[in-house]
A protein has these predicted regions:
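Histidine-acidic metal/acid-base catalytic patches
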Residues: 116-131, 140-227
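Hydrophobic faces of well-ordered beta-strands that scaffold small-molecule active sites
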Residues: 1, 25-29, 66-68, 106-108, ...
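Active-site acidic/histidine proton-transfer and metal-coordination neighborhood
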Residues: 37-131, 219-223
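Acidic (Asp/Glu)-rich catalytic clusters
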Residues: 8-29, 53-62, 96-101, 121-127, ...
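Charged helix-capping and loop-helix junction motifs
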Residues: 11-17, 43-51, 81-93, 143-151, ...
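Acidic-and-aromatic substrate-binding clefts and catalytic sites of carbohydrate-active enzymes
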Residues: 1-13, 35-37, 74-76, 110-117, ...
Length: 227
């Protein structure tokens, strides 16, 4: 569930959603124009308030996971991005504490970071309380590390799935674009997966079912060869 900032104050809406949402729920916290490290103190304060309120709303919905962005502006160099890491880890202290209190797992998603190495210090600073969410389209379109491999080395426990033409963040169905999910996604099918597509998701669901079937077939072959 994306927590649209334009609707975040609507109490009746969240009460209705809570009754209608079945099973496990994950949310995406607000991110537009937010940055805990903005040079503008007003933006820093607003960012903290929106993240904390978003976590409160997540708990109201019964969500067990909440994804957020680091807020890094697009086009930062690896050196600039790395310089942000420890200050960001410190600025996240109150957010991590609120998530812990509410019982919501906090997940940092790659967005405009140039490379995965700049996220590692943040994740390590809050080890055990902050996980990683991987979005392959963001890596391909926004970063200087388009290959999923280095990002997957961060050990994502949550993945946002969609496809892209490699130029824009299209949110296409899986298999329609250039991300090659069949080449790398199979070992992560046991993690929490969220489809983020802007079209009928049936094609993506069929893709995932077929990929899972290929994995089972390969596993069965290994068992047969081991006998």
């Amino acid at each position: 569930v994306y927590l649209d900032p334009a609707l975040l104050e609507e109490d009746a809406l969240f009460q209705s959603l809570r009754r209608r949402l079945p099973g496990r729920v994950s949310v995406h916290l607000p991110f537009w124009n937010l940055d805990l490290l903005s040079p503008d103190p007003e933006v820093r304060g607003l960012t903290l308030r929106r993240l904390l309120f978003g976590l409160d709303r997540a708990a109201e919905l019964g969500a067990d996971r909440a994804v957020f962005h680091s807020g890094i502006p697009h086009g930062r160099t690896p050196e600039e991005a790395l310089e942000r890491a420890l200050p960001l880890a410190e600025a996240l202290g109150l957010v991590v504490r609120r998530a812990r209190t509410l019982g919501v797992r906090l997940l940092l998603e790659n967005s405009h970071e140039p490379c995965p190495e700049v996220l590692r210090p943040v994740l390590e600073a809050h080890a055990g309380e902050l996980g990683f969410c991987f979005d392959a389209a963001h890596a391909r379109v926004f970063s200087r590390t388009p290959d999923p491999g280095p990002w997957l080395a961060l050990g994502p426990e949550h993945l946002h799935l969609n496809d892209t033409d490699g130029v824009y963040d299209r949110h296409w169905n899986l298999g329609r674009g250039v991300l090659g999910h069949r080449e790398w996604l199979l070992p992560f099918l046991g993690r929490t997966l969220v489809l983020e597509v802007r079209e009928d998701p049936e094609a993506s669901l069929a893709f995932l079912q077929a990929l899972a079937g290929e994995g089972r077939t390969a596993f069965d072959r290994l068992l047969m060869e081991g006998r």
